[in-house]
Each structure stands twice: as C-alpha cells, then as structure tokens.
C-alpha cells in the first residue's frame, strides 16, 4: 500500500505516520532522506543530484520523480511505502501520475490554523534532555522550568507564532491545493487513490483509529 499523508505543519502527521508504518510494515520515505542516500551511494542519479546541489540550485521535480521511482523499486518498498512531505505541489503530483507512480490512499488530517498555532506556540523544550512540555496541555510543575533539573525551558524558533503562521501560509498556497487535486483524481478514477478526510482534533488514539480505519 502506497500512502500519502496530507495536512498542515503541526497537524500530527508525524505521529500518525509512525502508527501507519508499524501497522502495515512499510517504510516512511522522505525526499530529503532519498537525496542524501542517493548522493552518498554515488549512483548515476546521485552524482547528477550532487552536481545540482553543489551548484546551489534547486533539484527539479523531474529529478525528484526519478529518485522516487528508484526508491520505491527497492525491496523494503515491496509492500508499499508512506510518502513523507511529498508531493508538496500540484506539478509534483501531476509528475507522479505521468510517471505511473500509483498511489493507493491519500489521507488528509485537517486541523484549523488557530488550533495549530495554539499547539505549536505553546511548546517549551529543555534543550539538554529534549524533554518537551506545553504551557496548556502538559505544563511543567514550575512555570518555565524543567521538572527534573529545574533548568530553563525555551521556545524553539520553529514554534514561535510568527514562524508557525508563515509556514501555514506557505502550506495553504502550495500544498493545500493537493487536497482538491487528489479528490478529483479519486473521483475520476473510480476511487483510486482512496481519499479520506479526517478531523485531526481529539486524542491521539481516536485519530489513529480513524486513520487506520480509512486505510483498511
């Protein structure tokens, strides 16, 4: 089963991806990991990619699709895979269709922007240990201090409200149109890929149950 997870940053895709890969015994593949692996392995495609990256240029969708086709032909993808952060744009999605990369299921995890801002902007981290807190959902015993060491907690730059809102605006302009693209593709293609819209609010367990039900 080949699965694409859609959803804004902070919607909980990473958490659900873990459950999907474990349940179906499929790898999670990201373009970043694929790029690094191909360059490291020195494959013909990897050497071509290295040239582009060394020149400080953006890797074309065409090269990315070649990379995807090479990756999904590997033995660990025999039962399928979960695409992580790909496709990000309509041209990439169209290129996958044109290249004959079939997708079985597309799951959209939908969460309101304000909910996401609240989730992410409320995170606090103890840098030395990696322990994470949330000022509303999982507050430390003493405000701004790590429970174990009493050291200061920080807010990562990625979690600052203005950063989160910028990432959400990029998502809405570039990636959200994929929702419409895959809904139309599914409707025009007798339900392949199977498209599922899931509300990403509630307990992790309840969302996981809905995601797995959509894929079964």
From Swiss-Prot:
Gene Ontology biological process terms in this record: AMP salvage
Highest taxon in the source lineage: Bacteria
A cellular component term, taken from the record's GO annotations: cytoplasm
Presence of keyword Protease: no
Keyword Transmembrane tagged: no
Function, in words: Catalyzes the reversible transfer of the terminal phosphate group between ATP and AMP. Plays an important role in cellular energy homeostasis and in adenine nucleotide metabolism.
Domain remarks in the Swiss-Prot or TrEMBL record: Consists of three domains, a large central CORE domain and two small peripheral domains, NMPbind and LID, which undergo movements during catalysis. The LID domain closes over the site of phosphoryl transfer upon ATP binding. Assembling and dissambling the active center during each catalytic cycle provides an effective means to prevent ATP hydrolysis.
UniProt name for this protein: Adenylate kinase
Organism annotation: Pseudomonas entomophila (strain L48)
């Amino acid at each position: 089963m080949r699965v694409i997870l859609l959803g804004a940053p902070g919607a909980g895709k990473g958490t659900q991806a873990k459950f999907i890969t474990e349940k179906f015994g499929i790898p999670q593949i990201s373009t970043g990991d694929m790029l690094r692996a191909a360059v490291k392995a020195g494959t013909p495609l990897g050497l071509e990619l290295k040239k582009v990256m060394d020149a400080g240029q953006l890797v074309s969708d065409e090269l990315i699709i070649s990379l995807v086709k090479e990756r999904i032909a590997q033995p660990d993808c025999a039962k399928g895979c979960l695409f992580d952060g790909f496709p990000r744009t309509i041209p990439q999605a169209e290129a996958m269709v044109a290249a004959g990369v079939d997708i079985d299921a597309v799951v959209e995890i939908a969460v309101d922007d304000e909910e996401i801002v609240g989730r992410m902007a409320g995170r606090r981290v103890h840098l030395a240990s990696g322990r994470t807190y949330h000022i509303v959902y999982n507050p430390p015993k003493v405000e701004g201090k790590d429970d174990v060491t009493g050291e200061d907690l920080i807010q990562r730059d990625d979690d600052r409200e203005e950063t989160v809102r910028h990432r959400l605006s990029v998502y809405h302009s570039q990636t959200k149109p994929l929702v419409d693209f895959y809904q139309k593709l599914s409707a025009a293609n007798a339900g392949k890929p199977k498209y599922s819209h899931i509300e990403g609010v509630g307990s992790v367990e309840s969302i996981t149950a809905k995601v797995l039900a959509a894929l079964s």
